[in-house]
């Protein structure tokens, strides 16, 4: 639930949201309580059917459901796109196949955040801000992208840009340093050594 609340905090009351891979549409239900309209989309029909069950009258008013394997037709760039709970390459595939160029995208990918940042820039999306979320002892990286061009350092592409929770960022980085050092005790990997050096010398 921490992830949903964090995503919601980056969405203003006047936005409309498209949640691709909506699962149980919990984000849409959370937004509905604030009077925010959303489209809950998923590739699996049974997920949509289950998500529609036991909706309150308020939720029915603010949530539209659609079956789609990516960005559904009928949306435009003014809608805020949420891509959460999926891998980096799935996120990139969805965007590469989309006919819409969004003004704002919120992601929580499961892996390869450095690749996500670099590839999103190639697609014309730029990192606005980030936040580390800790949920059930796991760390998640929320990234907000927009279309305002910015330049980023090698360090920022690896660790992130404009982090909002430096305490959790430091905690996550220390976890990664310990994890990578255990690997380096068994094998000498130059790329991993460079990553550890960047993490160790990062200025919070």
Where are these regions (language model features)?
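Conserved SAM-binding motif I beta-strand of class I
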Residues: 37-42
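Class I S-adenosyl-L-methionine
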Residues: 3, 72-73, 89-204
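Gly/Ala-rich phosphate-binding loop of Rossmann-like dinucleotide-binding domains
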Residues: 32-33
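Glycine-rich SAM-binding Motif I of class I
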Residues: 25, 29
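S-adenosyl-L-methionine
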Residues: 49-75
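Conserved alpha-helix/loop element of class I SAM-dependent methyltransferases that forms part
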Residues: 1-13
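Conserved class I S-adenosyl-L-methionine
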Residues: 14-23
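Conserved SAM/SAH-binding beta-strand->alpha-helix loop
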Residues: 44-46
């Amino acid at each position: 639930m921490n992830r949903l609340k964090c995503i919601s905090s980056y969405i203003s009351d006047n936005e409309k949201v498209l949640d691709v891979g909506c699962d149980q549409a919990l984000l849409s239900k959370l937004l509905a309580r604030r009077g925010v309209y959303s489209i809950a989309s998923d590739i699996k029909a049974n997920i949509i059917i289950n998500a529609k069950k036991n909706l309150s009258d308020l939720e029915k008013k603010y949530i539209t459901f659609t079956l789609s394997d990516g960005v559904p037709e009928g949306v435009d760039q003014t809608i805020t796109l949420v891509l959460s709970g999926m891998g980096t390459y799935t996120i990139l595939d969805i965007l590469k196949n989309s006919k819409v160029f969004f003004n704002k995208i919120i992601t929580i990918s499961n892996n390869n955040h450095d690749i996500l940042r670099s590839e999103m820039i190639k697609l014309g999306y730029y990192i606005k801000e980030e936040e580390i979320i800790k949920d059930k002892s796991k760390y998640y990286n929320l990234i907000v992208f927009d279309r305002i061009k910015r330049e980023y350092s090698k360090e920022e592409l690896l660790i992130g840009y404009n982090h909002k929770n430096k305490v959790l960022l430091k905690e996550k980085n220390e976890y990664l340093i310990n994890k990578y050092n255990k690997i380096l005790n068994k094998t000498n990997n130059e790329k991993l050594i460079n990553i550890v050096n960047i993490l160790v010398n990062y200025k919070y």
